[in-house]
Amino acid sequence: MSKNYYITTPIYYPSAKPHMGHAYSSIIADFFARFKKIDGYNVYFLTGTDEHGLKIQRSAEKLDKDPKEFCDEISKTFEDLTKTLNLSNNDFIRTTEDRHKVSVQNLWNILENNKQIYLSKYSGWYSVSDEAFYNEDEVEEKDGSKVSMSSGSIVEWVEEESFFFKLSEWEKPLLDFYEQNKNFILPESRRNEVISFVKSGLKDLSVSRKTFSWGVKVPTDDNHVVYVWLDALTNYLSSLKYPCLLYTSDAADE
């Protein structure tokens, strides 16, 4: 029986049309997908677009367009790129699709039912373009605005109610898993980097937003939308028909 091999590109953020960097990532993934097929593996190759969030909402507003209309137009250019490059992908997923929404909300319910999610408040410096929060020592004053020292992007002070994932509880289980599965992260230099990061201490992760509406609604509180950490990342499961997992009878071996 052939082993299963699952390979993905990052799902691309369609705030603008694709450029050479998107082609570069896609071609590398396609190379490995084709090589593994030749090597006898049952390959599933995924690419797609991450279409939710404040950045998309604001980009659409600037053009006086509905966010879905904006995403439909830009996402098509990414899907067209897969044909231009003659990629061998099995699927092109969009996080605005119903199949993805079902997966995200199912995963949310599992986490909430297992007491891995709680409601609290978050405050900090937020960059819309980076979709990231920064600590006080990571921002500086420049030309009258606060900016991220690492990216140079303008940041805004944000205070809001948010649901949090108890990531801090997973520090030891993750380290144990990495120790028992030494080839899980490759190359070794990256494995060491990840282990060092986890050992430095994990903080609970903000996984919802109330300050914008363009996203998958939290199933138990429609005042919140699911944030990127649980929305976009779940695409790697939703393409495999999670929670049904109908694509194959067993999980990917690699």
Residue map of PLM features:
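Cys/His-rich short segments
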Residues: 116-163
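Short clusters of hydrophobic/aromatic residues that line enzyme substrate/ligand-binding pockets
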Residues: 56, 60, 127, 134, ...
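Short acidic, glycine/serine/threonine-rich loops at helix termini
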Residues: 57-58, 104-105, 130-132, 138-140, ...
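N-terminal Rossmann-like or analogous alpha/beta NTP/dinucleotide-binding catalytic cores
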Residues: 2-119
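A short, hydrophobic C-terminal helix/tail in secreted or cell-surface proteins
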Residues: 250-254
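Alpha-helix boundary/capping detector
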Residues: 62, 108, 137-138, 204
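Structured secondary-structure scaffolds
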Residues: 2-47, 99-103, 147-249
